[in-house]
Regions:
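Small-residue-enriched hydrophobic alpha-helices in membranes
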Residues: 1-129
């Protein structure tokens, strides 16, 4: 899989934080999942700093979906990994509410990721739980 630049990882992580908070609960488990995503692209010593920056961006931004432009420019493998990580965060509490589903539909549409593949990723992760 290709690597992402640090600023791209932070921007995408802000989307992950947004997905985690959209149901108004931001758990330690969700933070750990986001840290795992960050670790897959950055050095271990950058993880806490990257998460902190991502949380600040999420807190201060009304335009989080602008970060989909970062995703859109990447390979299908990276897009799949990002979608998979978004779903991991969303289903970590064993529920998917309407806001979470809507967020995923919007993100997939904005990055030109096929709905069918998005649904397949979601179902695989649900079946693993």
């Amino acid at each position: 899989m290709n690597k992402l630049e640090k600023e791209s990882v932070i921007g995408i992580s802000a989307l992950l934080v947004h997905a985690a908070k959209i149901d108004e609960i931001y758990s330690d488990h969700e933070k750990d999942l986001i840290k795992n995503f960050i670790k897959s692209y950055l050095e271990n010593n950058d993880v806490d700093e990257a998460l902190k920056k991502a949380e600040q961006i999420e807190n201060n931004s009304n335009q989080l979906l602008n970060f989909t432009n970062i995703i859109k420019k990447n390979s299908i493998d990276i897009k799949k990994d990002i979608i998979k990580n978004l779903w991991k965060v969303i289903i970590s509490d064993n529920t998917i509410d309407q806001y979470e589903s809507n967020l995923m539909r919007r993100i997939c549409g904005l990055i030109y990721f096929p709905d069918k593949e998005c649904a397949e990723i979601k179902m695989k992760l649900i079946n693993l739980k």
